[in-house]
Amino acid sequence: MERRQDDQPASAARKLTLLVVDDNQEVGESLAMLLEALGHHAVVVRNWQMAVEQVKLCVPDAVYLDIEMPGISGIEIGRRLRHNPETANAVLIAVTGHSLPMYMDDALAVGFRHFLVKPVRLEDLATTVQSVLAG
């Protein structure tokens, strides 16, 4: 029996392009593997310069940003992405090892939609992906 295209699950209908920015390669790769297990395409970069170059190649649907990185914070990268017309609509998701309210407040003030604490649970990632898909 042939399967019709509209019989596919809703999540398979749209494959998201997701950018992961984390200075820790293992953490970034792990996050990307989980996002890909959810059926989406994830690209990992290790610093803000690489993030800027990557968004020139392909504008992501969402950006998972480590909050504490050498040289520039994920909050500042998020602020810059918000002011760039090409990435102004990308969903920003903060990823950090800190659950202090000040980090969350700073992220939300810049326009981050979600705030995840490491280690990130698959269920929490799935929630962020569903939020991006819902618009």
Walk through the language-model features, giving the residues of each.
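Two-component/phosphorelay signaling modules centered on CheY-like receiver
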Residues: 25-43
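Active-site beta3 strand of CheY-like receiver
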Residues: 58-64
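Short hydrophobic/Thr-rich beta-strand motif most characteristic of the beta2 strand and flanking loop
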Residues: 39-46, 54, 116
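Non-catalytic signal-transmission and effector/linker regions of two-component phosphorelay proteins
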Residues: 1-19, 123-135
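Active-site residues of response regulator receiver
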Residues: 66, 96
